[in-house]
Swiss-Prot record:
Alphabetized SUPFAM superfamilies for the sequence: PP2C-like (SSF81606)
Organism for this UniProt entry: Drosophila ananassae (Fruit fly)
Family per record: Belongs to the PP2C family.
Keywords: Hydrolase, Magnesium, Manganese, Metal-binding, Protein phosphatase
Enzyme Commission identifier(s): 3.1.3.16
Name of the protein: Protein phosphatase PTC7 homolog fig
Listed GO MF terms: metal ion binding; protein serine/threonine phosphatase activity
UniProt binding sites for Mn(2+) 1: D102, G103
Length: 332
């Protein structure tokens, strides 16, 4: 953010706090910005995928799908953004790393691209996951170092976002996770939930969030450090499905419906077939988000928190990463 924007800060702060902390702060669309060329998903990622398969190491068959709340340029997938959501997928000889982040929309009222922070955070995590010193067992370290980088830049990246980063370590076939806020992950096996991350929230629809803001205003906004990210580890088995998503999916698609849609895809190796599954899930979530009478998970939570909400889905950006665990026979 340029210094001239900071000079307008006092006039916006009270309105901004209401936007960020209000329980019905629906996130809004974004403007397209470029993604660093050196983080192209077709470069290092594709090369290490080939390495893993040639070396007969465990790997993930991974697909991505998403929908912005409002129509946006078709370039958004290349920019790894769906509205104010962002994502990354990284593959190294040690691990496969996946991440999603959801930018907090309240920043838009201050003239800030609410999705930029999420995009830059995921870009940093992607780059750092491919460095030699990342062993694939501590995804929270990616959040710590990436968050610090955004804060330390000469032109700090101002904003907030949730973050969920997971890594499948090839040698021990274990999923290591770090989750902050209300994005999250699931591990599915034979149509059952083996594990699902828990939401971290201050209040209803006010998730934990990484934030970069002027130091004298930190007390006025929610600012949760990456050390608050919940970490866990989960043994994986061949055919397991690993799912990462932003709240645009979880707030609109009931778990029972999600499980039913994905039940037949256990053990799927074909990328096109898995992509079809992701497409169906995202399209169903988008459809339900526009249904004013559907008892969505968001509407159910609103009533449980005595929040006045007319019911139905929650229009929002939706991002989904869906991966199937593939283990060559030599490792079974």
């Amino acid at each position: 953010m340029k210094p001239t924007m900071m000079s307008n800060w006092p006039g916006f702060i009270n309105r901004f706090v209401r936007q960020v902390r209000h329980p019905l702060d629906f996130r809004r669309p974004y403007r397209i910005t470029g993604f660093p060329d050196n983080l192209s998903p077709l470069g290092y990622f594709g090369q290490t995928k080939q390495y893993a398969r040639a070396a007969q190491e465990p790997y993930l068959v991974t697909v991505v799908q998403g929908r912005s709340k409002k129509p946006c340029s078709p370039r958004e997938r290349a920019n790894r953004r769906f509205g104010e959501d962002s994502w990354f997928v990284s593959s190294t000889p040690r691990a496969e790393v996946l991440g999603v982040a959801d930018g907090v929309g309240g920043w838009r009222d201050m003239g800030v691209d609410a999705g930029r922070f999420a995009k830059e955070l995921m870009g940093c995590c992607c780059g750092r996951s491919e460095q030699e010193d990342f062993d694939g067992r501590n995804p929270r370290s990616l959040l710590v170092s990436s968050y610090q980088e955004l804060k330390d830049r000469d032109d700090p990246v101002v904003g907030s976002s949730t973050a969920c980063v997971v890594a499948m370590h090839r040698r021990d076939l274990t999923l290591y996770t770090a989750n902050l806020g209300d994005s999250g992950f699931m591990v599915l096996r034979n149509g059952r939930v083996m594990h699902r991350s828990e939401e971290q929230t201050h209040d209803f629809n006010t998730p934990f969030q990484l934030t970069v803001a002027p130091s004298h205003k930190l007390d006025s906004v929610h600012c949760d450090g990456p050390e608050k990210a919940a970490v866990s580890r989960h043994p994986l088995a061949p055919g397991d499905l690993v799912l990462l998503a932003t709240d645009g999916l979880f707030d609109n698609l009931p778990e029972s419906m999600l499980l039913e849609m994905l039940r037949k895809f256990h053990g799927v190796r074909d990328e096109k077939e898995l992509q079809d599954a992701a497409n169906q899930v995202v399209e169903k979530a988008r459809e339900l988000s526009m249904n004013a009478s559907f008892p969505s998970p968001f509407a159910v939570k609103a009533r449980a928190n005595n929040i006045s909400y007319s019911g139905g889905g929650k229009p929002d950006d939706i991002t989904l990463i869906l991966a199937s665990v593939e283990v060559p026979k030599v490792h079974r």
